[in-house]
A protein has these predicted regions:
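Soluble N-terminal domains of membrane-associated systems
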Residues: 1-100, 109
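Catalytic cores of large soluble enzymes that bind and process phosphate-bearing ligands
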Residues: 6, 23, 27, 72, ...
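Hydrophobic alpha-helical hairpins/lids featuring a short glycine-rich hinge
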Residues: 74-145
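Helical membrane-embedded segments and adjacent short helical loop/helix-boundary regions
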Residues: 74-79, 115-120, 167-168, 234, ...
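Generic detector of multi-pass transmembrane helix bundles and their immediately adjacent loops
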Residues: 185-295
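A generic alpha-helix surface/boundary motif
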Residues: 12, 29, 33, 82, ...
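Core alpha-helical transmembrane segments of integral membrane proteins
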Residues: 113-208, 285-293
Length: 295
């Protein structure tokens, strides 16, 4: 293999690592650092990497190599981010040659997502936990748990497969709120506001929002604005879905339910219950977003 071919192969591996990181929710600075770490270890210092929120541009000043990849905004799979990050440090420590690194990256990229039942469990437990955190009582939490479960069943079986991102976001919030309204009208729960807050928590685009802020703080203004726009669009879709569901409910029952605001139920207001609820909600969302258990 000539020096030029070797250099191009190294840049291909670095680009592959960046691709996996970016499409699974890593921030821009992590993507750039990882790509530079890999190429530097293999002796290629002529690579230049320009990373946006949905694209990677790779060029070399020592050859004619150039690569542009479009990477659409997708779901969050933090286990793959952790795996690539760990692999890059192993590469820097000299534990893998180029062929092994390429093979490892392919294994990470082809790794299956979390099983559907784990995602459904994470959504249900997260909705239940955060309903309690925001003041819901035991019946409110039970209603949020059931709604969170059916919400993610709907997300996995229908909206993520057949609907666009915007329409899917609106329909997810619509379905969640309609289920909350149905549960409340049947007598499950005492605070509709708390049930809805807990139920829609799995839909909140928290990772894109935080990454957008971090990118702006790192002076990556294009990527930061793009991700913040994506997150704000998600918030808008949730609000539109919730509002539409109240309009439908009011049309069916000749009147919109008056929300009393967030009510702190004394059943779960104690420090012990709040700590337990926060732990359950955080652990559930860690499962939902694919955070690995072993570090």
């Amino acid at each position: 293999m000539s020096n030029t071919e070797y250099s191009d192969e190294v840049l291909e591996v670095a680009s592959e690592a960046g691709h996996i990181l970016l499409e699974n929710g890593a921030e821009i600075s992590r993507v750039e650092d990882t790509m530079e770490r890999i190429s530097s270890h293999y002796g290629v210092n002529s690579g230049h990497f320009f990373v946006l929120s949905n694209g990677i541009f790779t060029t070399s000043s020592a050859s004619k190599y150039a690569n542009v990849e479009f990477i659409p905004l997708r779901g969050i799979q933090l286990s793959k981010v952790v795996a690539v990050n760990r692999l890059s440090f192993d590469i820097a420590a000299g534990k893998h040659d180029l062929a092994e690194a390429h093979k490892k990256l392919n294994e990470i990229r082809d790794a299956p997502a979390k099983p559907a039942w784990e995602q459904i469990l994470g959504s249900a437990a997260g909705a239940c936990g955060f309903c309690a955190v925001f003041g819901g009582g035991f019946m409110d939490c039970a209603a949020a748990l059931v709604v969170g479960m059916f919400l993610y069943i709907y997300c996995l079986t229908f909206s993520s497969r057949y609907l666009s991102k915007i329409v899917g976001g609106i329909s997810n919030a619509l379905v969640a709120t309609l289920l909350c309204l149905a549960a409340y009208r049947m007598g499950f729960g005492t605070s509709l506001s708390n049930i809805i807050i807990g139920a829609i928590m799995p839909l909140i685009p928290g990772v894109p929002f935080v990454n957008g802020v971090r990118d702006l703080a790192d002076s990556d203004y294009i990527a930061g604005i793009t991700r913040l726009t994506d997150a704000m669009l998600g918030f808008f879709c949730i609000a539109l879905g919730v509002g539409t569901s109240f309009m439908l409910d009011g049309w069916l029952f000749d009147g919109i339910i008056n929300l009393s605001g967030v009510i702190v139920n004394p059943e779960t207001a104690g420090l012990g219950w709040q700590s337990l609820a926060a732990f359950i909600g955080t652990a559930a969302f860690a499962i939902l977003f694919g955070v690995p258990i072993a570090q």
